[in-house]
């Protein structure tokens, strides 16, 4: 568990709710490397998402501002099928909308700690199950690197340097 890394976005127009959810995520993250970002609106998230699309888990409120969480999730699903989407809202009438975006789960506020921790465990399991990996042969070892961990590649002559979230590996071409 200690080498698991996740990038999680919390999108909620209620700052108190976003902070509460972030606290629960931090509890879940005790044995993991987790980067948490919070956004006050779907628009704020989408503005950032244009530059930073590597989120693993999205915890989304549904009713917020001009763009709702379901519309935002539909836009994200157009180019990211693997991100795990969890709706967290006070409105049960939107449950059916979650199926349109293949949401992992739908939690009703106020969220119970155990519920969210279980859903995050399920999201992590799904991410691992669907994960694509590269087999990299370095000078002294062969390692497996999950594709989602790769940030960029650097090529110089006969060597490729693979820059990951937490690791750098040099591979001969």
Per-range role (PLM):
Residues 1-9:
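Non-catalytic signal-transmission and effector/linker regions of two-component phosphorelay proteins
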Residues 2-3, 15-37, 78:
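Two-component/phosphorelay signaling modules centered on CheY-like receiver
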Residues 11-12, 39, 58:
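Conserved sequence signature across two-component system core domains
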Residues 36-44:
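Conserved Asp/Asn-Gly motif in the active-site loop of CheY-like receiver
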Residues 40, 108, 172-173:
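Short loop/edge segments at beta-strand edges and connector loops
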Residues 44-129:
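CheY-like receiver
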Residues 118-173:
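Conserved binding/recognition cores within well-folded domains
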């Amino acid at each position: 568990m200690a080498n698991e890394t996740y990038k999680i976005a919390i999108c909620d127009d209620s700052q108190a709710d976003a902070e509460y959810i972030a606290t629960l995520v931090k509890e879940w993250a005790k044995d993991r490397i987790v980067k948490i970002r919070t956004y006050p609106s779907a628009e704020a998230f989408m503005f950032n998402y244009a530059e930073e699309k590597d989120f693993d888990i999205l915890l989304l409120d549904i009713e917020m501002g001009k763009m709702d969480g379901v519309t935002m999730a539909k836009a994200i699903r157009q180019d990211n099928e693997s991100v795990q989407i969890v709706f967290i809202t006070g409105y049960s009438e939107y449950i059916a909308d979650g199926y349109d975006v293949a949401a992992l789960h739908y939690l009703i506020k106020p969220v119970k700690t155990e519920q969210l921790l279980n859903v995050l465990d399920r999201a992590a399991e799904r991410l691992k199950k669907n994960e694509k990996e590269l087999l990299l042969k370095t000078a002294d070892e062969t390692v497996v690197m999950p594709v989602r961990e790769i940030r960029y590649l650097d090529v110089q002559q006969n060597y490729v340097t693979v820059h990951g979230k937490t690791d750098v590996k040099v591979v001969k071409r």
